[in-house]
Amino acid sequence: MKYYLAPLEGITTYIYRRAYHTHYRPMEKYFTPFLVPHTKKDFNTREKNDILPAHNPGMNLVPQILTNDAKGFLDTVEKLKGYGYDEVNLNLGCPSKTVVSKGRGSGFLIHTEELNRFLDEIYAKADVKISIKTRIGKFDADEWGELLRIYNQYPLEELIVHPRVQQQFYKGTSGSGCICGCSEGM
């Protein structure tokens, strides 16, 4: 089993990660709260402070990107490479209504053709490792088979699965049966 510190917006900032890493059992990976691509040349002050290697000493930090726009994703990857990052995580798991209403996070999962085109482009053009955090669907666990088929087409660094659909947020029974079949489908 691998131990990772999942991102929680507004909580697991570099200050929290640094304190945790110093005083508790270090995690194998730490994920940043999601970065949303924007057109500015660089990250804003909060984002920059969160990803600066000097603020995250000794940690295997993976910046997380939340978008449904391949160009925005690729532009953000280029900015992150400037800070020395060679791995990013694509957030396809966020269930927040404000995120989902824009077709991002788990809101992207229902648009399988667009998702497949998006992944085609980012995996063809990005020269970093890309992992994906996903849910098993937006409305129903039956969506998982198609999502897994799509993911299997790409050289994912790893697939991190939250075994719930977007509609469940963080409540209800998990779809752990989907996960049991995950290794068979990969």
Please identify what each model-predicted range represents.
Residues 1-186:
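Flavin-dependent oxidoreductase catalytic cores
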